[in-house]
C-alpha cells in the first residue's frame, strides 16, 4: 500500500482518473484511457516501454480500479495485476491510497520505486493544475492592498480569498 496527501479536493483529484488528457499528464505523452468499466488503459513509459490494462470500476469521487501490466509481458503481463486507488477527504485536501495486487513479492518489490515516483509526480501534476493561476492571484492580492478605499479593498480581497478567510481589519493583513 502507498498513501499520499494531495492538496486538492477529492473531486479535483478524481478527474485525473477519468480524463484522458489529465491521465497523460502524470503518465506521459502517448498514455490514454477510456474512463468506463471495461475501457482500455494504455501507458507509454520512457524507453519505449508500454503498459496496458482496463478499467474495472469507477466510484466517483472515491475509488478507481484498473488492471495493469506490461505489453512485453515482463515483469508482469498486460492486465494481470489490479490497482485500486481510494480517495478520502483529508484536512489538507485528499488522502490517496493505492493498493497494487501483484502475483508475488518479487513483482511487488519491482514496483515500489515506480509507484513512489508516479505518486510524487501525480501530486505535483495536480498541484500545477490547482495552482495554475497562482501568479495572477498574487498580483490581485497586492492590488487589493494598494487600494485606498477600505470597502473596495475588502471586496477585492473577498473575490480572491477562500471563503474561510476573514479579514479582521481592513487596514492590515
Model-derived features: positions:
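Hydrophobic ligand-binding cavity/cleft-lining segments
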Residues: 1-32, 134, 152-153
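Hydrophobic/aromatic beta-strand elements that line small-molecule binding cavities or substrate pockets
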Residues: 2-4, 52-57, 81-88
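Short acidic-aromatic low-complexity motifs
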Residues: 7-11, 130-160, 164
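A solvent-exposed, acidic/Ser-Thr-rich amphipathic alpha-helical stretch
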Residues: 10, 29-44, 51-53, 59, ...
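A short, structured loop/turn motif at beta-sheet edges
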Residues: 10-11, 56-62, 86-95
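Hydrophobic pocket/interface hotspot
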Residues: 13, 23, 41, 55, ...
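Beta-strand/loop substructures that line and gate deep hydrophobic ligand-binding cavities in soluble
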Residues: 67, 71-124
Amino acid at each position: 500500500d502507498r498513501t499520499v496527501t494531495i492538496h486538492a479536493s477529492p473531486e479535483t483529484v478524481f478527474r485525473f482518473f477519468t480524463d484522458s488528457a489529465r491521465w497523460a499528464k502524470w503518465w506521459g505523452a502517448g498514455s490514454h484511457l477510456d474512463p468506463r468499466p471495461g475501457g482500455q488503459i494504455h501507458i507509454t513509459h520512457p524507453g519505449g516501454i508500454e503498459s496496458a490494462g482496463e478499467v474495472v470500476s469507477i466510484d466517483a469521487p472515491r475509488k478507481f480500479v484498473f488492471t495493469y501490466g506490461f505489453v512485453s509481458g515482463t515483469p508482469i503481463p498486460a492486465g494481470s495485476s489490479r490497482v485500486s486507488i481510494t480517495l478520502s477527504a483529508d484536512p489538507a485536501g485528499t488522502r490517496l491510497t493505492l493498493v497494487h495486487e501483484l502475483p508475488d513479492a518479487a513483482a511487488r518489490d519491482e514496483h515500489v520505486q515506480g509507484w513512489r515516483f508516479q505518486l510524487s509526480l501525480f501530486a505535483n501534476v495536480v498541484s500545477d493544475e490547482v495552482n495554475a493561476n497562482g501568479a495572477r492571484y498574487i498580483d490581485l492580492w497586492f492590488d487589493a492592498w494598494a487600494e485606498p478605499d477600505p470597502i473596495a479593498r475588502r471586496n477585492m480581497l473577498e473575490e480572491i480569498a477562500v471563503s474561510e478567510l476573514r479579514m479582521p481589519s481592513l487596514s492590515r493583513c
